[in-house]
Amino acid sequence: MKSKMAAKDQKRLDNASSSDTKIEFEFGGAPGVTLIMIGFPLLMYYMYIGAVLYDGLLPTPEDGQSWADFLSHLVSLAYTHAYPTRKAWTIYWTFLILEGAGYLYLPGVYGKGKRLPHLGGKQLPYYCSAVSSWYLTIAAALILHFTGVLKLYTLIDEFGPLMSVAICSGIFVSIVAYISALVRGVEHRMTGSHVYDFFMGAELNPRLFGWLDFKMFFEVRIPWFILFLLTLGTALKQLEEYGLVAGEVLFLLMAHFLYANACAKGEELIITSWDMYYEKWGFMLIFWNLAGVPMSYCHCTLYLAYHDPSTYHWNPWVLAVWAVAYLFMYWVWDTCNSQKNYFRAQERGVTVDRKTFPQLPWKYIENPQSIPTKTGDSILCSGWFGMARKVHYTCDVFFAISWGLITGFNSPFPWFYPCFFTVMIIHRARRDINRCRERYGEAWMEYERRVPYLFIPVSFADLPHKDKLTD
């Protein structure tokens, strides 16, 4: 048994070595990433100005106003309402530092990542304490709010300055990370284009004190915790102003809680993901997690916060049915990811069955069917992955559309995330398919023959009979 496992590990390592040294240009190369690095922060300011200062409408030049005057006006508004104040710097970086301390010192579990070819097959250890950090963060936020030390809706009132701090922090940390990697000589899979390499990153596994893995820390905690706190702040703001919380805000609070909670409770399963294993720590990951996700995905929250509940009121019965549908899709999404990750963990002989909330039925498959591949890995073709190859992506799109739909159609900004994310998820699905076809060859083609559906299964009729449901 041990010799078989060792042989499989060696096959995985040999296959990973070829992909680990392969150099590709994505996003249009250096010109494309330059446009992204300049354009996206500007888009964030434009959306903020429209959401807050134009009542959710698109800022456009007034009659007779030149484009030069209009752009100057936008810059003036950004400077006046989104200047990165000392208060905003203090709030943002206190949060980051405390979350970092929680990463290191709160209760958690240990895990090991994939074998890294550039480290001779070494598996890096990971300490996963996001669940403890998550619930302590919620408790601390509520204590600060109700004691009056820091009202949580300050995050809404000071959103402009906080967004600017997040943008500046994302750029600053990206510069430090890139220069640090070059100075220490730990750059990896470089293309020779400083602009492109700055965007994609230079270092693969940056760490602090040997344990705080920056990629995992930024991806799991920072964006989703901030997004939830913004929505919680909106709920508390409404409670103070109206004496109740609108059902639409409660719906969004539920949605953002479930997503952030899922990221925290499944942290030890993320350590073998593509982001942890392959993506380098550059502007793309750093800026996106520090600023892009929390400060642009939140426009559904901002719309609800800045408008009277009567302007986006849904029929309570429709809202209730919608919430039930959302919970069903969450169950599919959570168990789909769980089945995949448990299968990978079982394949490597290391599983940790944590009793974190919520515990859902069918989170893993007993005696799953799989297709062996030339790499030593196997392709799961049971459970949700026996019905469609990207069911979890379908759920992601449903979530995104729900976040926009809850606000109605009076503003385009809450729909930025659903539109952007849908395009991104389609691109990611195509990328995943191409990579899997290249990596697994005929085994992947066999999987496509067995499971011809990509996003939506043709029938759920035989769901209880395909695999044994397991709590």
From Swiss-Prot:
| Induction summary | Expression is induced in the absence of erg4A.
Q: Which GO terms describe its biological process?
A: ergosterol biosynthetic process
Q: Which GO terms describe its cellular component?
A: endoplasmic reticulum membrane
Gene disruption phenotype:
Deletion of both erg4A and erg4B results in fluffy colonies with severely impaired conidiation and increased susceptibility to antifungal azoles itraconazole and voriconazole, but does not affect virulence. The double deletion leads also to the loss of ergosterol production and accumulation of the ergosta-5,7,22,24(28)-tetraenol precursor.
Name the EC number(s).
1.3.1.71
Please give the superkingdom of this protein's source.
Eukaryota
Practical applications: Inhibition of erg4A and erg4B might be an effective approach for alleviating A.fumigatus infection.
The UniProt GO MF terms for this protein read: Delta24(24-1) sterol reductase activity
Q: Which residues are glycosylated?
A: 15
Residues annotated as transmembrane: 33-53, 89-109, 130-150, 159-179, 216-236, 244-264, 282-302, 313-333, 397-417
Asked if the Swiss-Prot or TrEMBL record annotates the protein with the keyword Endoplasmic reticulum, the reply is: yes
Which pathway is it part of?
A: Steroid metabolism; ergosterol biosynthesis
The cross-references to Gene3D superfamilies, in alphabetical order and at most eight, read: 1.20.120.1630
Locations listed in the record: Endoplasmic reticulum membrane
Any idea which positions bind NADP(+)? 340, 344, 380, 392-393, 432, 436-440, 447
The way it spans or sits in the membrane comes to: Multi-pass membrane protein
Q: Which reaction does it catalyse?
A: ergosterol + NADP(+) = ergosta-5,7,22,24(28)-tetraen-3beta-ol + NADPH + H(+)
Keywords noted in UniProt: Endoplasmic reticulum, Glycoprotein, Lipid biosynthesis, Lipid metabolism, Membrane, NADP, Oxidoreductase, Steroid biosynthesis, Steroid metabolism, Sterol biosynthesis, Sterol metabolism, Transmembrane, Transmembrane helix
Q: What does this protein do?
A: Delta(24(24(1)))-sterol reductase; part of the third module of ergosterol biosynthesis pathway that includes the late steps of the pathway. Catalyzes the last step of ergosterol biosynthesis by converting ergosta-5,7,22,24(28)-tetraen-3beta-ol into ergosterol. The third module or late pathway involves the ergosterol synthesis itself through consecutive reactions that mainly occur in the endoplasmic reticulum (ER) membrane. Firstly, the squalene synthase erg9 catalyzes the condensation of 2 farnesyl pyrophosphate moieties to form squalene, which is the precursor of all steroids.
Q: Family, per the entry? A: Belongs to the ERG4/ERG24 family.
- Other observations noted: In Aspergillus, the biosynthesis pathway of the sterol precursors leading to the prevalent sterol ergosterol differs from yeast. The ring system of lanosterol in S.cerevisiae is firstly demethylised in three enzymatic steps leading to the intermediate zymosterol and secondly a methyl group is added to zymosterol by the sterol 24-C-methyltransferase to form fecosterol. In Aspergillus, lanosterol is firstly transmethylated by the sterol 24-C-methyltransferase leading to the intermediate eburicol and secondly demethylated in three steps to form fecosterol.
Instruction: Quote the protein name from its UniProt record.
Output: Delta(24(24(1)))-sterol reductase erg4A
The organism named in the record is: Aspergillus fumigatus (strain ATCC MYA-4609 / CBS 101355 / FGSC A1100 / Af293) (Neosartorya fumigata)
Lineage of the organism: Eukaryota, Fungi, Dikarya, Ascomycota, Pezizomycotina
